[in-house]
């Protein structure tokens, strides 16, 4: 079983429009609602891959009830931690046109110390039967800054590998605990390190405690610093992928978690992450992927050793 933890889940609302133009009125062509948040999206992708998964998340109010009902309908196991009365799960809105997506994120509800204790206990109770743990997304107000570090240590005590996908202090505050892999995007990587070159920045995160870093670089694929070497993985330039990119990173995390659970070698793990991420872009909503596209992309992915720019060292 792969356990996903989403401390700040959301009800994802997606509006489809022909073309998004700021400062004008739009006629919405389609509306879709589903349980979301980064870890929930990861669980949905894992479920689509046929992997057994349990999504752990705090749920509150009528919005939280909608999330739970959606996960139940999808057949995804959910361990929901109930929040106090009057506390409601947030919403996100994605406006998607033929070219790109614009996403609006509500702030999460403030969690109490009791909420955190219950969430931590829920995760701890699942670890003895877990093969991998995924920690995804922002920490809502009220959670301690070292919440992810605490969960990483709990997992390591049980011999469970951890994939962390977070930004800012939620990422940097967990590095010393030694997550098995962290998956920032290019912006998050630079923000965490202050280093412009992605390879040097990834090495800096390893120096800070991460055991591996897999950075998503958009159309340039993935850059990875791992115990087995430094790698770049991407589709060939002629394999143009267009669609909704909002769930691409979560699909990559799902592939990495599955690979860690199976102890897959890093080059193969990265190939699956690139192929699954591209297939997610071709699906209409986050947490989904096109299975045929996934199978078609996989043999096209090129995984090659990564080398630093001429004249630079791999890390500071």
Question: At which residue positions do the language-model features occur?
Answer:
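Structural motif
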Residues: 1-3, 102, 131-132, 212
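Glycine-rich phosphate/adenosyl-contacting loop at the front of the ribokinase-like
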Residues: 1-56, 65-66, 239-241, 307-316
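Hydrophobic anchor at the start of a short beta-strand
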Residues: 2, 51-54, 78, 162, ...
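Short, conserved phosphate/pyrophosphate- and ester-handling motifs at nucleotide-, phospho-/glycolipid
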Residues: 46, 185, 249
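Conserved N-terminal subdomain of the carbohydrate kinase-like
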Residues: 48-131, 296-316
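Short beta-strands and strand-loop turn motifs
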Residues: 103-105, 130-138, 165, 183-186
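Conserved phosphate/ATP/ADP-binding segment of small-molecule kinases
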Residues: 146-231
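Conserved phosphate-binding/catalytic region of the ribokinase-like
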Residues: 172, 198-316
């Amino acid at each position: 079983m792969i356990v996903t933890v989403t401390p700040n889940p959301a009800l994802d609302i997606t509006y489809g429009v022909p073309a998004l133009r700021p400062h004008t009125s739009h006629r919405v062509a389609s509306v879709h609602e589903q349980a979301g948040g980064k870890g929930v999206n990861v669980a949905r992708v894992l479920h689509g891959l046929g992997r057994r998964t349990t999504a752990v998340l705090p749920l509150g109010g009528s919005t939280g009830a909608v999330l739970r009902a959606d996960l139940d309908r999808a057949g995804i196991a959910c361990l929901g931690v109930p929040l106090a009365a009057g506390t409601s799960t947030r919403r996100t809105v994605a406006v998607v046109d033929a070219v790109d997506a614009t996403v609006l994120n509500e702030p999460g509800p403030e969690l109490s110390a009791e909420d955190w204790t219950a969430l931590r206990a829920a995760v701890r109770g699942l670890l003895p039967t877990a093969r991998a743990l995924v920690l995804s997304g922002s920490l809502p107000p009220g959670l301690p800054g070292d919440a992810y570090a605490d969960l990483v240590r709990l997992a390591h005590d049980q011999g469970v590998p951890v994939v962390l996908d977070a930004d800012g202090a939620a990422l940097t505050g967990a590095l010393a605990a030694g997550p098995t892999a962290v998956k920032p995007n290019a912006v998050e990587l630079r923000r965490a390190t202050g280093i412009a070159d992605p390879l040097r920045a990834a090495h800096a995160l390893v120096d800070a405690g991460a055991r591996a870093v897999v950075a998503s670089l958009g159309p340039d694929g993935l850059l990875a610093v791992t115990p087995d070497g430094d790698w770049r993985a991407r589709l060939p330039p002629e394999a143009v992928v267009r669609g909704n990119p909002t769930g691409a990173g979560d699909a990559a995390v799902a592939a990495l978690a599955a690979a860690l659970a199976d102890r897959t070698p890093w080059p193969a793990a990265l190939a699956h992450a690139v192929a699954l991420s591209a297939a997610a872009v071709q699906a209409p909503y986050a947490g989904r992927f096109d299975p045929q596209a996934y199978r078609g992309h996989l043999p096209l992915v090129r995984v090659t050793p990564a080398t630093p720019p001429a004249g630079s060292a791999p890390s500071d």
